[in-house]
Amino acid sequence: MKVLSNPRFLAVYSAVLTVVFTVVVLCAAAGLRNQTFGIITARRINIVEPDGTVRLTISNRADFPGAWNRKKEYPRPDRREAAGMLFMSEEGTEQGGFIWGASQLPDGTIENHSHLSFDQYEENQVFAIDAGQEGKDKFSRISMVDQGDFPIEEKRKGNEGIDKLPVNEQDAAWERFFATHRHDVKRLALGRSPDGSVGLELRDQSGKVRIVLAVRSNGEPILQFLDEDGKVMNRPK
């Protein structure tokens, strides 16, 4: 028993255990590095870089993430309406996403939606594809947008401050904000409207519609060229 209580023996015993434990852990880690699975069931999966930076999130509706900016996640309760995916840059900032959902309400009304978008660097979406249905109304569209050249973090901070203002002061506050921060401008819209018409709208850099190509729900074709005041310059018969 004296041998077991000898300090030298205890030191050697401790060292041996440490080595054995380290070998076991390393071998286990090596074995886990490359694994093959048939089916994985999860509520949310984060794909990360070796340094922990999240690059892709696949999530259900309940656990859908907020907005990511510079490796920090900000709450977005409004995003808990669909399952989907979020794409993040090497810097941990949101770069786009894909969400979807469909359900039938107790009264039989159908709600169906899907959205795929890609973002400008440190900004909001510049290209998006949407499709959906609300009751009997169906739509689908492709959109292209010019975004401002300021970091979206500035808009987030501005939004936090403006939300604290009285409701009757918020519109004026946003006008002051966008006086120094260029607002997003829709440049192209291609889609099908709920009334069954299809069309293409092309806009100038200020967001004014300049060309319209469409087929109305009654089958009538439309081709319009508009000036900067919205006046039709010519309309082929």
Give the label of every model feature segment.
Residues 1-34:
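Single-pass membrane-anchoring alpha-helices
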